[in-house]
Every structure is written in C-alpha cells, then in structure tokens.
Swiss-Prot record:
Top-rank EC class of the record's enzyme: transferase
Family: Belongs to the N(4)/N(6)-methyltransferase family.
Function: The subtype gamma methyltransferase (M) subunit of a type I restriction enzyme. In the presence of the R subunit the complex can also act as an endonuclease, binding to the same target sequence but cutting the DNA some distance from this site. Whether the DNA is cut or modified depends on the methylation state of the target sequence. When the target site is unmodified, the DNA is cut.
Residue ranges, annotated region (Disordered): 424-443
Record: residues binding S-adenosyl-L-methionine: 148-153, 178-180, 216
High-level lineage: Bacteria, Pseudomonadati, Pseudomonadota, Gammaproteobacteria, Enterobacterales
Reaction catalysis annotation: a 2'-deoxyadenosine in DNA + S-adenosyl-L-methionine = an N(6)-methyl-2'-deoxyadenosine in DNA + S-adenosyl-L-homocysteine + H(+)
GO terms of biological process kind: DNA restriction-modification system; methylation
More details: Type I restriction and modification enzymes are complex, multifunctional systems which require ATP, S-adenosyl methionine and Mg(2+) as cofactors and, in addition to their endonucleolytic and methylase activities, are potent DNA-dependent ATPases.
Protein name (record): Type I restriction enzyme StySPI methylase subunit
Annotated keywords: Methyltransferase, Restriction system, S-adenosyl-L-methionine, Transferase
GO MF, one example: site-specific DNA-methyltransferase (adenine-specific) activity
Length: 529
C-alpha cells in the first residue's frame, strides 16, 4: 500500500474518535505517539529507542481498560526516558482517548494496515512522508492552531530548491511550526547526495545531528515538529532536546540559536498572542514580523542566504519599518521579492510575499553598506485565481517564477525582464510610479527589475511594489470618504460574522467557530468577539 493510501485510511479512522469527542488536532497527537511505536516496530529500531516492555507488541497484546491504562503508563514512562530525544517527544503527553474500545479499534486498525509496498517494508523516510501527509490533512481540516498558517508544501519546496542547501550547511527556521522547511531542506540534500551515501561518515553525522535547527514557541506544535524530524532521521542536538528547540525567538532563546548558513521561515502573522518581545533589537518595534526580520539579519553569517515569508505590512510599514527595510537593503543583497497570491494560507485573505536575500554580497560577504543594487519582483498575485480546496495551489503555479529566478541560489543568474504566464499580457497597466517611463509590453509582465535608487526616491524605501491592475479593482475617486467606507464595512462584517458563527454551530463545527473567535479576540487585543 502506498503512502497516500495509508494516509487516507489513517485519517478515516479519525471519524470514530471524533464521535467520542476527540478533535482533529488531538487525533494527530494520538497518531504521533502510535505511529512512532509502529515505526520502530516496522523498521527494526525498537532496541534503539524503546525500552523493553514499552513497545508496539506490548500495547497490541492488551485490550479494553487494561490496554488504555497501559497506554497511559507508557506515555508517562517514555516521557521520562533516559534517551533525551524520546523524552522530548513524549514529555507531558497525555492521551485524550477516554473510551477503551476507541484505543483498541485504533491500534487494531493500524496493525491491520498493509505496511508494505510490494515486497518492501516502509523505510523511516516513508513513515516521515506519511506523517507529513497527516499534518497537511490536519491543516486542511482545522485551519486553526498549528494549521492556521501552515505553509503550502509547493511553496516550501520551491523556496528550498532555490536556496539550494549544501552538505555541512546549517539550516535554521526560527518559527519552525511542524518543521516543513527543515524536512524539505533535508530531502533536498539527500536527493543531491544519494541519500547521504556519497558523504563521508563525519558529514553524514553532521547532517543528522547538526545541520537543522528550529525554534518553536508552542509545546504541542514543537512535539509534532520533533516527531516529523525524527521520522525523517533528523536527530538534531540532543543536549537541546532534538532539532526543534522550545522557546521564543523574540527573547533570549532566539539569541542563543547558532548562526545559520541558510534561514528559511514563515513567521506567524498577526498579534501572535503569547509571543513577548523581550529581546533588544537595533530597531525596537512591537511588530513581531519586523522583529523576526531583524533576527534573520543578525543570525546570518557573511554570505548566508535567506528566504522569509512576510505579510504586506512588512513591505510598507513606516517608522521603524522603514528603518528595518533600509537596514536590510544596506547589510544584505535583497535580490528578489515574490508577491504571493491570496488564499494559499488557511488564514484566508492574508497577503504575503517571499523576500530572498544574502548577507553582504557574493563579491564581498563582509560588506555591510549598500549591498542591494537592483531588486527583482515577480507578481504572482494580480489576476490570479482564488486558491483554496477547489483550486489548489500547486508546483505548476510556481514553475515560471523558478525559471526566471535562475539556478544561482544568491539570485545572480542572468535575468531579463518579462514573463507573461497566467495571461499577464491581458492585464491592464496601473497608473503608478512603477510604470512611469516603462515599456508598455514589459509593464504587462509579471517579472520586473527596480533599482535601489528608484526604491529610495520614488517609493521612500517602501517595498510594496506593484504595477499590474487587478481586473476587479475599483476606481478610488468614485468611492465615499474612507471613514464612511470603514464604518459600513465593519458593520457588515460584524453582522456577517454573527451569521457565520451561527451557521457553523448548526453544521456541528462549534470547535472551529470557537477557534475563529479566538483569532478575532487576538486581533482586537483580547477584546471578546
């Protein structure tokens, strides 16, 4: 049975648990524990990780209340295991299963699945890929918690493919989530090194224990990330509890992260309640995304490269935001901006971009002034489909951007303006600074170049650069005063939100409605929605 079939069958088992009050998120947590036990059994690694008496067959051999009690004891025992990595995965883990028959059915069903593909058993990476599939399923279904800003896997794959991590390079994600960027970086290096077999023993050991470092604020999400890494044979530094550390990037934990040759990350959007900024940055600000940008600049060594997914406000916010962008373009070679389409994140309506940059310049990695000369911008947002379940965002949508980006990971491949995928030539040209003195044909393309001097003089160091006119845009001159529009919009939104809340509860999605209300409360500074 292939991995996709196994993921589908494992996810179908969730329906029975849902009837018993187990949420999707809790189901993934249960599967994480059980899948680890099963992985050790199927790959012959039980002796490496699990003490005798606390293995898959020990759990399977029991039924009913005895099995549930044994399972609870097993979680406690492994959470205090002498092996630090196992301890980190199982620490403070409790089962949410309360009915013995549910656990028996889950264990029995998992045991009866065909864990073979032809004549071959599942490898450790097979279990890892399967687990990633479950995480994506969870993100699709919940759209909240760990899944609300789940980075689309096609985007992660493109970013890593363009950054091209090499053996013995350290890759860091300071907002690790479920470790998607780190897993993809590991996958890329393995694809270039015959699954690490082309490397000597020291280099292989480096890849397993030192190459990948993440930091995650939420304990439950960190556990999912640790499990993801472990299933992909990424152990990380055991003194820090594995590849994914628990802590706050915007505090002392972030300062203690090692320097990294590559940073690939998607910091949390919005207020991110619970994330306190206790760290002293060069440009103090309450905007957490701007603080993450400063962390990336600080953590990169000369010549290090980065890709960061950021919301639009990072590109145009004034005051400290302007100072931070100037710092970025001074100390780093900001060579590429990818304007992402809306709807690709499960937090609907969020407008995002990817910034690609190198610390210093390739010619002089230690350069810390005037490192940015030209910034190339690819507009994958204007007049693109509304992505979602019906219109999924795929690798094919990113292929034209990958082509014009080029093979050089520092963005130094020969580049030419002009790329007209997705009917760009049919777009109208906006009346904007970007199109003054622009060739009409080039102005309809998705791929343009803007000089550092132009960004300074024409945009006052804003990086909110767009030149195509959205076909659904409205002429601003015909609109009422802004305060009137804002009041009308807020009134309509309040009414619509109330109706949607009632509808979701009628449809039996009360937990999802509560999650969305919590997001609203965070957005309004804790005021009850």
């Amino acid at each position: 049975m292939n991995n996709n079939d196994l993921v589908a069958k494992l996810w179908k088992l969730c329906d029975n648990l849902r009837d018993g009050g187990v949420s999707y998120q809790n189901y993934v947590n249960e599967l994480a524990s059980l899948l680890f036990l099963k992985m050790c059994k199927e790959t012959g690694q039980e002796a490496d990780y699990l003490p005798e008496g606390y293995r898959w067959d020990d759990l399977k051999s029991r039924i009913g209340q005895e099995q549930l009690q044994f399972y609870r004891n097993l979680l406690v025992h492994l959470g205090a295991d002498e092996k630090k990595l196992v301890q980190a995965v199982f620490q403070n883990v409790n089962t949410t299963i309360t009915q013995p028959k549910q656990l028996t059915e889950l264990v029995s069903s998992m045991d009866s699945l065909d864990w073979y593909n032809g004549d071959h058993g599942k490898s450790r990476d097979d279990f890892g890929d399967m687990y990633e599939g479950l995480l994506q399923k969870n993100a699709n279904e919940t759209k909240s918690g760990a899944g609300q800003y789940f980075t689309p896997r096609p985007l992660i794959k493109t970013i890593i493919h363009l950054l091209k991590p090499q053996p013995r390079e350290v890759v860091q994600d300071p907002a690790a989530g479920t470790a998607g960027f780190l897993i993809e970086a590991d996958r890329y290096v393995k694809s270039q090194t015959n699954d690490l077999d082309d490397l000597d023993g020291d280099a292989q050991d480096f890849q397993i224990k030192k190459a990948f470092v993440g930091l995650e604020l939420v304990p439950g999400t960190r556990r999912l990330a640790l499990m993801n890494c472990l299933l992909h044979d990424i152990e990380g530094n055991l003194d820090h509890g594995g590849a994914i550390r628990l802590g706050n990037t915007l505090g002392s934990d972030g300062e203690n992260l090692p320097q990294a040759d590559i940073v690939a990350t998607n910091p949390p959007f919005g207020s991110a309640a619970g994330t306190n900024i206790t760290r002293t940055f060069v440009h103090p600000t309450s905007n957490k995304q701007l603080c993450f940008m400063q962390h990336i600049i600080e953590t990169l060594p000369p010549g290090g490269r980065a890709a960061a997914v950021v919301p639009d406000n990072v590109l145009f916010e004034g005051g400290k935001g302007t100072d931070i962008r100037r710092d970025l373009m001074d100390k780093c070679h900001l060579h590429t901006i990818l304007r992402l389409p809306t709807g690709i994140f499960y937090a609907q309506g969020v407008k995002t971009n990817v910034l690609f940059f190198t610390k210093g310049t390739v010619a002089n990695p230690n350069q810390d002034k005037n490192c940015t000369d030209d910034v190339w911008v690819y507009d994958l947002r204007t007049n693109m489909p509304s992505f979602g379940k019906r219109t999924p965002f795929t690798e094919q949508h990113l292929q034209p951007f990958e082509t014009v980006y080029g093979e050089d990971p520092h963005g130094l491949s020969p580049r030419t303006e002009g790329e007209w995928s997705f009917n760009a030539e049919e777009s109208e040209v906006a009346d904007s600074e970007e199109n003054k003195n622009a060739d009409q044909h080039q102005a309809t393309s998705r791929w343009r170049k803007f000089s550092r001097e132009w960004i300074r003089t024409a945009k006052s160091d804003s990086l909110d650069i767009s030149w195509l006119k959205d076909k659904d845009s409205i002429d601003a001159d015909s609109l009422p005063e802004p305060d009137v529009l804002a009041a009308e919009a807020m009134g309509e939104l309040v009414q619509a939100l109330g109706e949607l809340d009632a509808l979701m509860r009628e449809l039996g999605a009360g937990d999802e409605a509560d999650a969305q209300r919590q997001l609203l409360e965070e957005a309004f500074g804790g005021v009850k929605a």
